[in-house]
Regions:
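Structural/interface elements that position substrates and couple domains in central-metabolism enzymes
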Residues: 1-122
Length: 122
């Protein structure tokens, strides 16, 4: 979740989402991407549909991005993502596993909710 290099912009320069999503698609991942601002720019790099060995689709709803997901990567610290309750993540995801590259959630709250949570760089 989160495609821009920082919140408040649609700028993708140096965005960690680009390399990471590219690698996931090359390895056959099916991705549902969410970003409140940068999705149109991201679609220019990764058009919706089959890409490499995987697929990518886009949604304007965080809940839809999480629904039945096996893993969630957080690349941008959007306030919309920060508002998601750990319990909702647990309920929506098939496998509640989150890699948070922006440290937006409290690890103890995620653990208490039953979410396997990895906060990168903390």
């Amino acid at each position: 979740m989160g495609l821009a290099f920082k919140p408040g912009t649609d700028d993708l320069r140096e965005a960690p989402s680009i390399d990471n999503i590219s690698l996931l698609l090359k390895n056959g991942a099916d991705i549902v991407a969410y970003d409140p601002v940068a999705m149109n720019n991201f679609k220019k790099k990764f058009p919706e549909g089959v890409v490499e060995r995987g697929t990518i689709s886009y949604t304007n709803q965080i809940e839809e991005a999480l629904k039945d997901a096996n893993i969630c990567f957080i690349f941008t610290e959007w306030k919309e993502i920060k508002k998601v309750e750990p319990e909702a993540i647990k309920q929506l995801m098939r496998t509640p596993l989150v890699y948070d590259g922006r440290n937006i959630f409290d690890p103890e709250k995620m653990k208490a909710a039953g979410v396997e949570y990895y906060s990168i760089g903390r």
